[in-house]
Amino acid sequence: MIKQIPNIFTLINLFLGCIAVVFALQTETISIYVGDDLSSHYNIPEKLSLASYFIFAAAVVDFLDGFVARLLNASSEMGKQLDSLSDVVSFGVAPSIILYQLLRISFIKEEDGLQTSIAWLLPAFIVACAGAYRLARFNLDNSQSFGFKGVPIPAAGLFIASFPLILNFGNSFVDVSPWLTNKWVLYAVIILLSWLMVSTLPLMALKFKDFTIKNNLPKMILVVIALLAAFLLQWLAVPVVFIAYIILSLLYKQQPS
């Protein structure tokens, strides 16, 4: 029975991911017209932000299932496969739907945007496909204990999940809402994020072998950046920390081992 405890956490992760999918699918875009012209004022539906909250909650539970598995010495092959299946939904499908909705909003801002073909929105799901490929490769590779090959899907999922929260709450330093509702920026995010997941770039895992500065300098720098960014930038801290993670991993390049 003890060995099933981590699997319960994994299923909670999946459950939260499913709820995120439901909220992301229920969003409605409200467009405001001034006369006959579509105004630049529009809102990011509250339910899209709720989807983001559930993705972040799923990430917390995803961390806990691994922690509990190690604590109870209850790791199993079934748990490994179940974890990947859950992650595809929580950090692949749900964030892809968020991208789909943001693309829809970006087109609605344009003249004749309501006539946009769904084909322009479907590239959002390339992220889910890339994430599934990334997880399948990870399950077959035993060399990624203290380093990753390619960006882990939870990191990519949280990066995307931060977008609605940034748009809804903003920050006092910089307004990035025009970028996050620009179709070309979103397409670039889809391409770059998908490539980062399926690539074999050596990226650091956030595990501490010990607490020496020599062996953990990039991780300690990342922690400092994360704390400062969270204090100063609120939800914009998420993409900032994500980018810092990539840069630090490449600067302190280390092969997964």
Task: Describe these PLM feature segments.
Residues 18-21, 57, 61, 95, ...:
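Alpha-helical transmembrane segments of polytopic integral membrane proteins
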